[in-house]
UniProtKB/Swiss-Prot annotation:
It is found in: Host nucleus. It holds the Pfam family Foamy_BEL. A motif (Nuclear localization signal) lies at residues 214-223. The keyword Glycoprotein does not apply. Transcriptional transactivator that activates the viral internal promoter (IP), thereby enhancing its own expression. This transactivation is repressed by nuclear factor I. Also transactivates the long terminal repeat (LTR) promoter, thereby inducing structural gene expression, initiating the late phase of infection. It is therefore a key regulator of viral gene expression. It directly binds to and activates DNA target sites of viral promoters and those of distinct cellular genes. Required for viral replication. The keyword DNA-binding applies. Residues 224-300 are annotated as: Transactivation domain. Homodimer or homomultimer. Forms complexes with the host nuclear factors NFIA, NFIB, NFIC or NFIX. InterPro entries: Foamy_BEL (IPR004956). Residues 89-200 bind DNA. Residues 211-222 have a biased composition (Basic residues). Keywords: Activator, DNA-binding, Host nucleus, Transcription, Transcription regulation. This is Protein Bel-1.
Amino acid sequence: MDSYQEEEPVASTSGLQDLQTLSELVGPENAGEGDLVIAEEPEENPRRPRRYTKRDVKCVSYHAYKELEDKHPHHIKLQDWIPKPEEMSKSICKRLILCGLYSGEKAREILKKPFTVSWEQSETNPDCFIVSYTCIFCDAVIHDPMPVVWDSEVEIWVKYKPLRGIVGSAVFIMEKHQKNCSLVKPSTSCPEGPKPRRRHDPVLRCDMFEKHHKPRPKRSRKRSIDHESCASSGDTVANESGPLCTNTFWTPGPVLQGLLGESSNLPDLEVHMSGGPFWKEVYGDSILGPPSGSGEHSVL
């Protein structure tokens, strides 16, 4: 917000109810019947214009609050006071609402877009507020599909229902509108022009989704192991010694005989091609058949 623009005051004393009187805080010179005026601080930069509110009362700065805390340490701390929505400025309330509806990155993205953010109380549910985004070029209005609620227990803005993934997001609609925006505001002389399509009430829409929507079953992260197809799962075939292939055509013996004929090192080649002597000795299993040893290592 521009520092030269006027800002609505945070004119509330709900957090100071434990104090005796306001005249004790600001001094007897300001305890009159008129509006409360806090003494102005000396201006460091005389060129900077003063910031006045609509009531011509200067906004209370952090330093003024700090002085009051130092003078009255036994009272409640003003920095611990959390303002309610009606006590917030519009800019602060807008940012807190967007952070309640979206993440911080999405809220920053919305604030950078050429839309003005506003909200109004829902006629269906007085506790809910409908957030609207108005294009600054063509005055098109986009309603957020998720209402926002003020949680008085924790004093923060929250979503009406945990259904953001179902009802959708307004960010995608705003991006789509930016690409197709006509950049021309509707003419006031032709009120018979096209009107925006009526949207469903976001509160009723969220209630309908919550009532009729059935969530999908979540997938398990761990893969289920099929014990019947696993060779090391207690299957008796895995513990039996013998040839791994019953088809004699794929055994190395006939293949080597066709290539080398009768050779002196044919048995050694068969052993190496079937897994080697180490495999035969330790696992007691090869494609040549049952081992010729004592069988102590025939079973894992």
